Structures are given as structure tokens and as C-alpha cells.
Amino acid sequence: MITAIVQYRLPPSIDQAACAEHFRRIAPGFRDVPGLIRKQFIYAEDGWAGGVYLWRSRADAEAFYYGIRKRYGMDPEIRYFHTAAVTDNSVDPVLLPAAAE
């Protein structure tokens, strides 16, 4: 599994309320993204927004982010991390990948 932290600066015309509303509107569309396990939509008071994604593989993540670059014509800041384990207290116990990736 791979965790990707994606960040981008919002245009000045988009405030936190508009960003949150947009995220809530588009969130259901992420249910069918190939390889995506989980996504958290994030924004900060300083005008940055993005997402924390949990992917089955880096290839799945890179394929998705290529589409973002093509659609919006910008490169967000992306950091990739190998994910050794996930504890999600809202659903299942601990999620462990089959092998370290």
C-alpha cells in the first residue's frame, strides 16, 4: 500500500467554506477510482488544500494524478510513503498489506 499526500494552493477566490462545499460535492465520485482504498479531503487556513490518499499501488496513484495534471494543467505537490499498517477505528481493525512494498 502507498499513502500519497497531495497539496496545492487554492486560488484567492476560493475560501475555506467554498473548498469544503466542493469537497463534499465531489467526494462520492471517488468511490470508483481504480486502486483507491481511502481518501481524506483536507484544507488549511493558509490557503492550501489537497488530499491524503491510501492506494493499493504507486502505479494506481500515478495514473490518477496524471489525469489531474492533464485536467487542471497544474502539478500539485505530491509525497509518496510506503504504508506498513493502517488502524481505522471507524470500521475494521488493523489493515496490513501482504508484503512491504
Spans of model-derived segments:
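Short arginine-rich
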Residues: 70-75
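Short S/T/G/P-rich N-terminal loop/turn motif that feeds into the first structured element of a domain
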Residues: 1-48, 58-66, 77-101
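Conserved RNP beta-strands of RNA recognition motif
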Residues: 51-55
